[in-house]
Amino acid sequence: MKLHELKPSEGSRKERNRVGRGIGSGNGKTSGKGHKGQNARSGGGVRPGFEGGQMPLFQRLPKRGFTNINRKDYAVINLDRLNSFDEGTEVTPELLLETGAISKLKAGVKILGNGKLEKKLTVKANKFSASAKEAIEAAGGTAEVI
């Protein structure tokens, strides 16, 4: 196969439908909008959730819960991602950010226990799940809360 032989796959490219261009096109006159009414007008249509004047479902249901302003959002990382570091490395939130293991520090870093850790590491983080702490210590490393 050569570059000049490449063709788009069947059905992946579709021609634009030009409406209002004569009755023979199948989309002339009313351009597929039917006769009159709110939806036939320019800019016409109803907002999402509108039920024709009936009290919409989202307004019939009670409000629930609240947003906790004191919530702390942690950058989470699993144990299997820590295997990319060399044996004996001191893993800090700054190092994780530098290497791209996490994209933002947020309120801190939490280490979760998914995966298997095969290296002895000193891990410093704001929080550890119980299983993560256990696995780090089982691998001969230490888990320090900062």
Curated annotation (Swiss-Prot):
The keyword RNA-binding applies. InterPro entries: Ribosomal_uL15, Ribosomal_uL15/eL18, Ribosomal_uL15/eL18_sf, Ribosomal_uL15_bac-type, Ribosomal_uL15_CS. GO terms for molecular function: rRNA binding; structural constituent of ribosome. Residues 1-57 are annotated as: Disordered. Residues 21-31, 42-52 have a biased composition (Gly residues). Gene3D superfamilies: 3.100.10.10. Keywords: Ribonucleoprotein, Ribosomal protein, RNA-binding, rRNA-binding. PROSITE patterns: RIBOSOMAL_L15 (PS00475). Pfam families: Ribosomal_L27A. Residues 1-18 have a biased composition (Basic and acidic residues). One of its GO terms (biological process) is translation. GO terms for cellular component: cytosolic large ribosomal subunit. Binds to the 23S rRNA. Part of the 50S ribosomal subunit. Belongs to the universal ribosomal protein uL15 family. This is Large ribosomal subunit protein uL15. It comes from Bacillus pumilus (strain SAFR-032). The lineage of its organism: Bacteria, Bacillati, Bacillota, Bacilli, Bacillales.
